[in-house]
């Protein structure tokens, strides 16, 4: 599933209320071009609403526990944290923030970016946004990046 997300270059930040049509759910597995049906079939997404006018389903994580578990499983696919699990890394980061230990937070952030392999083929701005989204989402923060506004 993680491979499918990366192969399709799907923006995981969009999973918080993604929409899908009947056609997306009916595609045979070998012709799936979107990870949405697979995430739904796997239980990572559930139907939260339906718009009968446009025949569109609104999908989201069924609960916070599923979202957290899914995001934890994604983090290692986007970066390597040598000798640490992503959960331990996030917990340490949160503890440093709560203590007001900004220097340790900055050091962790530097280490975090240093752990991203230099030879990534898809090392784009979106890749970095995804990493930050995953990290801060695991910390329990609501994250939006590049929000367009009229101001």
Q: Can you annotate each of these PLM segments?
A:
Residues 1-151:
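Extended alpha-helical interface modules used as scaffolds for assembling large macromolecular complexes
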């Amino acid at each position: 599933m993680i491979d499918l997300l990366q192969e399709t270059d799907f923006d995981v930040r969009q999973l918080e209320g993604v929409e899908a049509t009947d056609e997306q759910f009916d595609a045979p597995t070998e012709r799936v071009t979107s990870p949405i049906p697979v995430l739904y079939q796997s239980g990572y997404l559930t139907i939260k609403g339906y718009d009968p006018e446009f025949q569109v389903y609104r999908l989201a994580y069924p609960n916070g526990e599923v979202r957290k578990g899914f995001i934890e499983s994604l983090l290692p696919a986007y970066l390597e944290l040598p000798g640490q699990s992503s959960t331990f890394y996030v917990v340490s980061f949160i503890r440093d923030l709560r203590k007001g230990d900004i220097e340790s937070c900055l050091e962790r952030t530097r280490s975090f970016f240093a752990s991203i392999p230099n030879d990534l083929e898809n090392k784009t701005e979106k890749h970095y946004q995804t990493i930050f989204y995953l990290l801060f989402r695991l910390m329990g923060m609501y994250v939006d990046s590049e929000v367009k506004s009229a101001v």
